[in-house]
Structures are given as C-alpha cells and as structure tokens.
UniProtKB/Swiss-Prot annotation:
Organism: Thermotoga maritima (strain ATCC 43589 / DSM 3109 / JCM 10099 / NBRC 100826 / MSB8)
Disulfide bonds: none
Reported function: Catalyzes the reversible reaction in which hydroxymethyl group from 5,10-methylenetetrahydrofolate is transferred onto alpha-ketoisovalerate to form ketopantoate.
Name of this chain's protein: 3-methyl-2-oxobutanoate hydroxymethyltransferase
Gene3D superfamilies for the chain: Phosphoenolpyruvate-binding domains
Any GO CC annotation of this UniProt entry: cytoplasm
Binding site residues for 3-methyl-2-oxobutanoate: D41, S42, D80, K109
Pfam families: Pantoate_transf (PF02548)
Gene behind the chain: panB
Length: 270
C-alpha cells in the first residue's frame, strides 16, 4: 500500500484503517489485510492510562510507531502528530514529522482545519505525506467544550467543507472525518477528490477507522455509540488469567509437559 494506491481507492473500494500501538497488534492487523495502520495519539487513553490524548508526547509516540513498524514492516503506517508537536511553528512541525518517518511511518496525521493549510503544504513539500483530520479533533476538546458531534450548524458545516477543500488543495492525501453528521460527511466526501475516512461519521465516507480497543472489546467501561464491538476480548483474557491463577494455586500448572529434565531434548519452543 502507498499514498497513490489509497487515493485511487476513492469511489471504488472502501479503505479500512485501524489503530495499533505495539508490534503484536500490528502483525495481527497486517495479517487481517487491513489497508492502513494508524498509530494514534489515542495511545494516551487506551494504553498509557491518560484521561485523554493531550498529555501524549513525541517520545511516547515515536516508541510506539517504531514498535508497530517492527511488527508489520510492510504495512502502510500513519503516525498521529501529538498535541503541541506541530502547533507552535512550521519548522518544529517539519522536524517532528520527519522523526516519525525516520522510525518507520509512511505518513503523519494532523488534526485541524483550514487554519493548518499552510503547514500541510510545507510538510508535503518537505516529502512528508499528510492525512488531515477534521470534525471532532480530540486535541482541541477544551475549545469545543467536550466531545460533540460536528456539522450540526450551517456555520460549522461551511467550515468543515472549506477545511476539507483547503486540505486537499494543500496536498493532503486523505482526510479523517470524526463525529461529523452523516449528511455533511457525505457532502464533504463528494466535494473532494481525495479519500475520506470516517469514524462516527456515517455510511458514506470512502473508508472507516476504529480504535483497536473499541472494536475488540478490551475496555469494559467504555463503548462509544459509533463503534461496533466485533469481539469481547476483555472477557476472553479475564477468563484465561483466572484459569491460570486457579491452576497455579492448585498445583495443576506446570505439568511434566511444561517442564525440563536432564533428559529433555530440543529447545524451549519444541
């Protein structure tokens, strides 16, 4: 997969993107035939225990992007630019985005609308592919006053349309639409020549993205309305750990099968 192939999928084949934060998850995503792996700053609230994405640092993101690359070396990987890694200056943004490519990302994702058009252009001119992200942009949640659905007012609808066109004009190869009302997401998708990838934005985007922990049911305390739980791995893992605990307590594990003697043959994997 590459940028040009993704762009050609618009209107022909739906794009499938998932988040992944480590090597084993990335390998599974690759083996499942997922088109794009996003190392999201959702790392913060899904893996690192933060309340939201704002505390996530460049250093943390770089570690996880590199891990994902090792797990799926031939996958198309997009790295989220975390809060304040690109907002302070164009020069700093180019430097930080370049760091992601150096550890294995194929592109970066930037939250924000038309006001970031010049920055997107500079990144693209520097050889860094950019995926845009408009609608609900979690890094700006304090400005929005919460996680609110976007595109409900005419003013907001016009802003989103302008932003999508500006990002396309400046060289973005795709745009994530997050929590945008379905009608507006459809209008945006039809108004730009680059793919839109929806999350909570209805049926008419060119692709869909979900968060790893949401679609696999790894968080029993949180289930966003727009997501679908394709498995309940929290319960699967919980039961496995409970069984391991039970067997150890009762002396049922390890057995002879899992033990070595001076007559054992072969290595640890035999």
């Amino acid at each position: 997969m590459n940028v040009e192939k993704l762009k050609k999928m618009k209107g022909k084949e739906k794009i499938v993107m998932v988040t992944a934060y480590d090597a084993p998850s990335a390998r599974i995503a690759r083996d499942a035939g997922i088109d794009v792996i996003l190392v999201g700053d959702s790392l913060g609230n899904n893996v690192l225990g933060y309340e939201n994405t704002i505390p996530v640092t460049m250093e943390e993101m770089l570690i996880h992007v590199a891990a994902v690359k090792r797990g799926a070396p031939d996958a198309f990987i997009v790295a989220d630019m975390p809060f304040l890694s690109y907002q302070t200056s164009v020069e700093k943004a180019v430097e930080n985005a370049g760091k992601f490519l150096k550890v294995g990302a194929n592109a970066v994702k930037i939250e924000g609308g038309e006001e970031f058009g010049e920055l997107v252009q500079k990144l693209v001119e520097s050889g860094i592919p950019v995926m845009g992200h408009i609608g609900l942009t979690p890094q700006f949640v304090n400005r929005f006053g919460g996680y609110r659905v976007q595109g409900k007012t005419e003013k907001n609808r016009e802003y989103l349309l302008r932003s999508a066109r500006e990002l396309e004009k400046r060289g973005a190869f795709a745009i994530v639409l997050e929590l945008v009302v379905e009608e507006v997401a459809k209008e945006i998708t039809e108004s730009v020549s680059i793919p839109t990838i929806g999350i909570g934005s209805g049926r008419f985007c060119d692709g869909q993205v979900l968060v790893w922990h949401d679609l696999l049911g790894l968080n029993p305390d949180f289930a966003p309305r727009f997501s679908k739980k394709y498995a309940n791995l929290y319960e699967v893992i919980l039961k496995a750990l409970q069984e391991f605990r039970r067997e150890v307590k009762k002396g049922l594990f390890p057995t002879e099968e899992h033990s070595f003697t001076d007559k054992s043959k072969g290595g640890v994997s035999s």
